[in-house]
A protein has these predicted regions:
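A nucleotide- and high-energy phosphate-metabolite-utilizing enzyme signature
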Residues: 1-162
Length: 162
């Protein structure tokens, strides 16, 4: 998502991530204490976030932003592929679909990367332009109501990025 997904990552970028895994519903990890796929990928994701965002003597490698994952902070840190598809089809807000314009699968098996890209395109093509425009106008109005205009804010305001 964000600058990583759109290919404009720079040294001060944070990583907007959604972690999606593909496993059977009853899949178990190997080892002394087997874990369900959900538990395994949750622990793996948390370890990854810690490793990438931990403070070091020269600073952090990257800040990780997971707020765009399905259900935000209330949702799991790693989501199964089927749950992600269901969420996008049935529960996601328009702004979450718009965020998909800057989403790219950056790791995984090639067939899954292709499957994600096809799914992303199908979601983006399913919207009627008129509905998106009306939703955007409403969303911008709510943003302007909630946040006072700052003349130095290049992001939010008439003629600015948002």
């Amino acid at each position: 998502m964000g600058s990583l997904g759109s290919g404009v990552l720079h040294a001060n970028s944070d990583l907007d991530l959604i972690i999606v895994y593909h496993a059977d519903g009853n899949a178990q990890s190997e080892g002394d204490r087997s874990l369900s796929a959900r538990q395994y990928y949750s622990r793996l994701t948390k370890a990854f976030i810690t490793a990438v965002s931990a403070p070091m003597t020269e600073g952090r490698l990257y800040e990780i932003d997971m707020r765009l994952r399905p259900s935000g902070f209330q949702g799991p840190v790693a989501t199964s592929w089927s749950s992600y598809q269901n969420y996008q089809k049935n529960e996601a807000w328009v702004w979450e679909h718009l965020a998909l314009t800057r989403a790219r699968a950056v790791a995984g098996k090639v067939f899954l990367l292709n499957e994600f890209e096809n799914f992303r395109n199908s979601i983006l093509k399913s919207y009627h332009r008129e509905n998106i425009f009306n939703e955007l106008v409403s969303m911008r109005a709510r943003i302007f109501q909630a946040k006072s205009l700052n003349p130095w804010d290049a992001k939010i305001g008439p003629g600015r990025l948002q």
